[in-house]
């Protein structure tokens, strides 16, 4: 964090390559994957993210030293995703975007679900970094229809992942019901009535990556097939007199 590393309530200085190496070595000792995932605190859309690995720590620090000393990052332990999802795209953590809605009776609903996949060797699945999204049946957790890339990134449509050639439609998301339950439980801790949750699926179940107050509803709109016909969207519009 601008030449400072904040872990819990401890603050230390990281003003040189040597101290960066020392601090990252210490952080990596506490991981199970020997990898750290760094995302810019003020970043959006997966831009500027990086992976720091124990196996190439010196190379990573030298390559990213300027950014690490001048910018602010959130440092997280790298997640190992579920093996079946890894078969589709192994370089990025491919996440569910689950949008919750809390109605006027304080009941939490899953408004819609989509899944995002990275392409090539990208370490992020965001559509703004070239990935694509595909609809997920919110009751069964099954991928439906084609995957779609952002128009700004080419607008490609995929029935199979372009790198691994794994068929998309019909793929069943592991631990999907557990992911729904996790979102519904977590939603009660937020004042926002609509939040987009990024959920990763590991071999032992779902984990929360982040919650988004501005969850790019245009992607969910396309994945659902048009939010205008969604009964809960109609309820929302009626509540705000539209």
Which sequence ranges carry the predicted segments?
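Active-site nucleotide/adenylate-binding loops and adjacent lid/helix of ATP-dependent enzymes
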Residues: 1-105
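Protein kinase-like catalytic core scaffold
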Residues: 36, 109-111, 207-209
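Active-site ExK catalytic segment of metal-dependent nucleases
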Residues: 39, 76, 114, 210-214
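Flexible loop/turn segments at secondary-structure boundaries
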Residues: 45-46, 119-121, 207, 216-218
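ATP-dependent carboxylate/phosphate-activation module, predominantly the ATP-grasp catalytic core
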Residues: 65, 80-81, 87-89, 93-178
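Coil-to-beta-strand transition motifs
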Residues: 91-93, 103-109, 192-194, 203-206, ...
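C-terminal active-site "lid" helix and adjoining low-complexity regulatory extension at the edge
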Residues: 156-178, 185-192, 201-242
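Hydrophobic residue at the +6 position relative to the catalytic HRD Asp in the kinase catalytic loop
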Residues: 197-199
């Amino acid at each position: 964090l601008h030449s400072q590393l904040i872990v819990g309530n401890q603050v230390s200085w990281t003003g040189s390559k040597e101290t960066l190496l020392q601090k990252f070595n210490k952080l990596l000792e506490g991981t199970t994957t020997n990898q750290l995932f760094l995302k810019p605190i003020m970043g959006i859309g997966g831009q500027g993210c990086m992976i720091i690995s124990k196996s190439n720590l010196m190379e990573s620090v030298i390559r990213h030293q300027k950014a690490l000393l001048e910018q602010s990052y959130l440092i997280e332990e790298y997640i190992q995703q579920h093996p079946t999802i890894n078969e589709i795209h192994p370089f990025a953590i491919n996440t569910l975007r689950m949008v919750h809605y809390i109605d006027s009776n304080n009941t939490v609903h899953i408004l819609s679900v989509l899944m995002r996949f990275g392409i090539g060797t990208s370490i992020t699945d965001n559509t703004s970094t070239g990935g694509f999204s595909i609809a997920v049946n919110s009751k069964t957790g099954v991928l439906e229809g084609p995957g779609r890339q952002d128009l700004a990134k080419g607008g490609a449509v995929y029935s199979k992942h372009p790198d691994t050639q794994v068929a998309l439609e019909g793929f069943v998301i592991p631990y999907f019901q557990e992911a729904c339950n996790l979102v519904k439980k977590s939603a009660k801790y937020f004042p926002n009535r609509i939040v987009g949750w990024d959920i990763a699926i590991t071999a032992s179940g779902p984990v929360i990556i982040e919650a988004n107050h501005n969850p790019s509803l245009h992607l969910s709109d396309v994945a659902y097939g048009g939010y205008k016909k969604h009964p809960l969207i109609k309820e929302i519009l009626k509540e705000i007199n539209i």
